[in-house]
Amino acid sequence: MAALSCYPPEWDDDERMSFLFSAFKQTRDVNTSDWDGKMKFWIPLILKHARAQGLLSISLSQLERDFRRKGFAPLGLRIVIQEMMRQGTLRKESDYVSNVSSGWLSWGMRQLVIRPLRWTIGTVLGSQMGPDEPLVIPEIIKERAALVLQRYQSSPLRALPLLSEEEVRTLCAEICPNPSALNLVLLQLQGDKKICVLERAGKKLVKFVRVSVGQVDPISESDLGIYELQQSEKLLSERLQSAGEESDRLTEEARTYNRAGNKHQALRCLRKRKLLERRITELQNKQDTVQGILERIAAAETDRKVVSAYQMGVSALKLALKDVTMEKAESIVDQIQEYCDLQDDLSQTLASVSDADIDSEDLEKELNDILQNKEMIVDLPDVPSGPVVISPQRPTEWETDQDIDSEDLEKELNDILQKEEMIVDLPDVPSGPVVISPQRPTEWKTDQASRSPADGSFSRSVPEPVLQ
């Protein structure tokens, strides 16, 4: 299995591979699980192998060589291929070409692509499938055709109206490594209406579809004329480059002959260079003329696209303004103004509702009630700022100014003043430690106590608090 790109997980399991390499039963009805198990293994593996190897067509003999393991080839590949052909996964190359070429293809495609493909089939094999008969894989061919189209649209060659066969092969060299694969891809693109193929003066010319266009247009005389001009410009550029190199060579030879003292040969070289310079000038003028024509063609193509865009814009604008006239617009504006005026009149009418049915006496009565309620609210006592003291001997009552006795107030005020004096006469908080005598209960020393001989500080004693 040297040609196989990757081994499946079961490839190293001899017992499993012995089963998969064995021949199929005569019919699927004999053993359904046996038949389906082999098909689920071989069909995906064949397609994966073809994609990895870049194969657009395969044959029975090729698969038997590629899947050979330990000197043995799978015995059921013919049945697998027949099942793939029944599903449409594989098709005979001859049937594929005939089916694709039966519709829109031009005579040029039949001559340039189909005939070489049919020639590669070889001798007639009859109704039986030969071991070397090519079998194409339509799914992979479509994938390669999409890649070729993408490659063209992203390359500088997209600016050219037509491509030669050599340019197409160079463009698709990595995608289609051999002529047979390229012919299959071109056939698929032709069937999808993505390219046109034409032979002119023994040269095969291919026209690709433009970007953002669904189908390719047929090759026109304008395309052929632009192609000829571009080929002429290319030829003139090559001749100019060759003439410039020849002029440099003659100049160098003239210097060499002059140093060698051969003045006659030096003058001869200069004479040839002068004639060559005239030729270079003529070639340059021709190239400028061709380039000017190509530039005008490009400008005309741009103008054509601009005019086409203008025309599409006018058509869109015309469609947008369909059934819209000046009279209709003025009528609509008048209707809008009329309905706006009507709305203003309605709003003004609704805002001027009469209040004659409202009784003035009822309003005055309601006003007097409001004023009386306000006076009652003003006569209420102030809200107490402190907590309400509730006496346990009698229910809680709100006191008024008439219930308060002046003598009681004076007595309460004297009590407050006496309490303040008592607070003022309290001794200061001792700043040092409290000295406790062991012979008597602890006492706070008063202000009249003598100075302590130990530290010279005064201590004050107060009566010891009594717990009640």
Curated annotation (Swiss-Prot):
Organism: Xenopus tropicalis (Western clawed frog)
Major localization class: cytoplasm
Location relative to the cell: Cytoplasm; Nucleus envelope
Family in the record: Belongs to the SNF7 family.
UniProt xrefs under Gene3D superfamilies: ESAT-6-like
Gene Ontology CC: ESCRT III complex; nuclear envelope
Any coiled-coil regions, as ranges: 233-303, 353-379
InterPro entries in the cross-refs: Snf7_fam (IPR005024)
Keyword terms of this UniProt record: Coiled coil, Cytoplasm, Nucleus, Protein transport, Transport
UniProt name for this protein: Charged multivesicular body protein 7
Annotated spans, Disordered: 428-468
A Pfam match: WHD_CHMP7
Function of the molecule: ESCRT-III-like protein required to recruit the ESCRT-III complex to the nuclear envelope during late anaphase. Together with SPAST, the ESCRT-III complex promotes nuclear envelope sealing and mitotic spindle disassembly during late anaphase. Plays a role in the endosomal sorting pathway.
GO biological process terms, semicolon-separated: exit from mitosis; late endosome to vacuole transport; nuclear membrane reassembly; protein transport
